[in-house]
């Protein structure tokens, strides 16, 4: 019998494998100075990097500057990619270093409303939008209350969609530590939201 879920899982795996091959090929071309490959790489990874950086900085203009710095670092360092991690986790690790360099001495903030307004989605009515904004404000406030390490980890796993292994590679810590920190972050976030009468 033909299981559609099994086939869709196989297709998703094949797509991910094809994407990884495409990314490695793009990096090879970028290392040779191919501007079209760099543009394709930016289209593929720019929004994910922007979302991750925005989660940490909370400032759209600053986040866009950091994305530009990150892509410049990719342009200059494409030949240094050794394939020990996924391309996505490699570029996010670069963005993480760029963000850390830019934020030295600055307070971290959460996602800004301008970023949220730019996100695609359905067009709910004004009442639903008002409730969604209120709930979102509660979650944003709760995330702001987390330790920076927890905010960053939540951003990597849920914001950027990295696997636990990829997040571990980016953070340069064992997968077990990622799991325990993620559990602690979820617990802390739930605690903060429960204190405010919300839950995840």
Label the predicted regions.
Residues 31-32, 55, 60, 69-86, ...:
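Sigma70-family region 2
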Residues 141-152, 156, 160-177, 191:
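Helix-turn-helix DNA-binding module
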Residues 1-48, 136, 141-144, 191, ...:
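N-terminal module of bacterial RNA polymerase sigma factors
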Residues 43-47, 55-58, 155-163:
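Short helix-capping/turn signature of helix-turn-helix
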Residues 2, 53, 82, 104-107, ...:
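Short, Lys/Arg-enriched C-terminal cap helix and immediately downstream tail that follows
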Residues 4-12, 19-23, 108-136:
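Internal acidic/polar
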């Amino acid at each position: 019998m033909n299981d559609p879920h099994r086939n869709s899982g196989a297709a998703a795996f094949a797509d991910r494998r094809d994407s990884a091959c495409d990314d490695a090929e793009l990096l090879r071309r970028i290392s040779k100075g191919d501007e079209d490959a760099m543009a394709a790489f930016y289209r593929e990874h720019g929004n994910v990097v922007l979302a991750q950086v925005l989660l940490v900085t909370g400032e759209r203009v600053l986040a866009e500057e950091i994305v530009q710095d990150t892509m410049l670092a990719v342009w200059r360092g494409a030949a240094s990619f050794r394939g020990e991690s996924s391309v996505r986790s490699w570029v996010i690790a670069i963005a993480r270093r760029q963000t850390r360099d830019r934020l030295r001495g600055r307070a971290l903030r959460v996602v800004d409303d301008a970023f949220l307004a730019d996100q695609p989605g359905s067009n709910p009515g004004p009442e639903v939008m008002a409730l969604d904004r209120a709930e979102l404000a509660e979650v944003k406030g709760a995330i702001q209350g987390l330790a920076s390490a927890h905010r960053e980890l939540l951003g990597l796993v849920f914001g950027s969609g990295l696997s636990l292994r990829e997040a571990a590679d980016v953070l340069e810590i064992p997968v077990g530590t990622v799991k325990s920190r993620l559990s602690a972050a979820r617990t802390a976030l739930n605690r903060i939201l429960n204190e405010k009468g919300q839950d995840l």
